[in-house]
């Protein structure tokens, strides 16, 4: 199964889905750019209306992210300190032993997480790795947690093996609009990413796919990223929106920060164009104050990464998140029994 990059000229609107993302909106990039141009309060109001139509606006889903294999990646993603192309403080490690993964998963569940996401810094997993990662999926899922993995590019048979092990979600981000992508990455094509998403869909695994903003892209290119995500068929069940965390030693280390209101606009536009997805605040949340996070929730974000670290970057401490939720009157989404996951 292959997914092609969507030409701007071919995108047309269709009726909005009402019960499931199987019939997604078809958006022109210019239409999404027009949403960005709305007065800030009008955009938030529209996003909040869409959000309340499909979700409890006071409920947030908690995911925890663990790096099960850090560093040593052959890709040259300009934002990533795990790349072997750049001199950073990240040290390469081998795949984490199963017992350590399970210990971390239990701790995440005890703190209220309902989904446990595991990342390995590979271009793609080798066959010798697949037996170990599928065992990890089975064991984590047996704890009653939803499971998500990001392992790089997948072949169809690898996606099927993960499905057979019970994987609920696979994360593979598009990162940016096609027009900006080549400025950030040269070792993996945009079509490579789309092909992996196609294999994941064909295997029957839920898709977690988002991108990174604040890498120096234009507003129109941010709109282009949202268009690519919203026009996947179906659009992702989970959309993580990352705000660049510049890391010393990477090509993007000195990138100027994105205007905070522009980040909130991106959350709102993602909610409007993908009304049934879980929009997740991801990397960069540590750099946001509580007022900015509250605006993001008002704009339609309904999921966060929960815990002190995201792969190699810091994240707000769990106690701070709980205090913020209490002050905002937010509740956390309960876990589903394992038997109900990835049906």
From Swiss-Prot:
Q: InterPro entries given for it?
A: Aldolase_TIM, BATS_dom, Biotin_synth/BioAB, Biotin_synthase, Elp3/MiaA/NifB-like_rSAM, rSAM
Q: Where does [4Fe-4S] cluster bind?
A: 73, 77, 80
The family database entries (SMART domains) matched by this protein are listed as: BATS, Elp3
Record-listed [2Fe-2S] cluster binding positions: 117, 148, 208, 280
Q: What is its EC number?
A: 2.8.1.6
Where would I find the Radical SAM core domain in this sequence? 58-285
**What biological-process terms (Gene Ontology) are attached?**
biotin biosynthetic process
Q: What function does the entry list?
A: Catalyzes the conversion of dethiobiotin (DTB) to biotin by the insertion of a sulfur atom into dethiobiotin via a radical-based mechanism.
Q: Which NCBIfam families match?
A: bioB
Family per record: Belongs to the radical SAM superfamily. Biotin synthase family.
Q: What is this protein called?
A: Biotin synthase 2
Q: Which organism does this record belong to?
A: Polaromonas sp. (strain JS666 / ATCC BAA-500)
Instruction: Write the gene name.
Output: bioB2
């Amino acid at each position: 199964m292959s997914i092609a990059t969507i030409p701007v000229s071919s995108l047309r609107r269709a009726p909005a889905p009402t019960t499931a993302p199987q019939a997604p909106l078809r958006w022109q990039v210019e239409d999404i750019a027009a949403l960005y141009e709305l007065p800030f309060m009008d955009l938030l109001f529209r996003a909040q209306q869409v959000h309340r139509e499909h979700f409890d606006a006071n409920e947030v889903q908690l995911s925890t992210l663990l790096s099960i294999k850090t560093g040593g990646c052959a890709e040259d993603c300009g934002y990533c300190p795990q790349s072997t192309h750049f001199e950073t403080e990240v040290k390469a490690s081998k795949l984490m032993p199963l017992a350590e993964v399970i210990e971390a998963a239990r701790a995440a569940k005890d703190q209220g997480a309902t989904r446990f996401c595991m990342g390995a810094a590979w271009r793609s997993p080798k066959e010798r790795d697949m037996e170990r990662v599928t065992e990890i999926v089975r064991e984590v899922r047996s704890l009653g947690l939803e499971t998500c993995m990001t392992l790089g590019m997948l072949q169809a048979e690898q996606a099927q093996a993960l499905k057979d092990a019970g994987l609920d979600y696979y994360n593979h981000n598009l990162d940016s609009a096609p027009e900006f992508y080549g400025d950030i990455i040269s070792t993996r094509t945009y079509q490579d990413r789309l092909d992996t998403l196609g294999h994941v869909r064909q295997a029957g695994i839920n898709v977690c796919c988002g991108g990174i903003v604040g890498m120096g892209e234009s507003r129109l290119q941010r709109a282009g990223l949202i268009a690519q995500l919203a026009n996947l068929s179906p659009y992702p069940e989970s959309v993580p929106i990352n705000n660049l965390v510049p890391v010393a030693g990477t090509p993007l280390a000195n990138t100027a920060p994105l205007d905070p209101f522009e980040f909130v606009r991106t959350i709102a536009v993602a909610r409007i164009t993908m009304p049934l997805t879980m929009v997740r605040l991801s990397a960069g949340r540590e750099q946001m104050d509580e007022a900015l996070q509250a605006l993001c929730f008002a704009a339609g974000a309904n999921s966060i990464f929960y815990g002190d670290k995201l792969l190699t970057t810091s994240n707000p401490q769990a106690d701070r998140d709980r205090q913020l939720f209490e002050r905002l009157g937010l509740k956390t989404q309960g876990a589903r029994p394992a038997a109900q996951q990835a049906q």
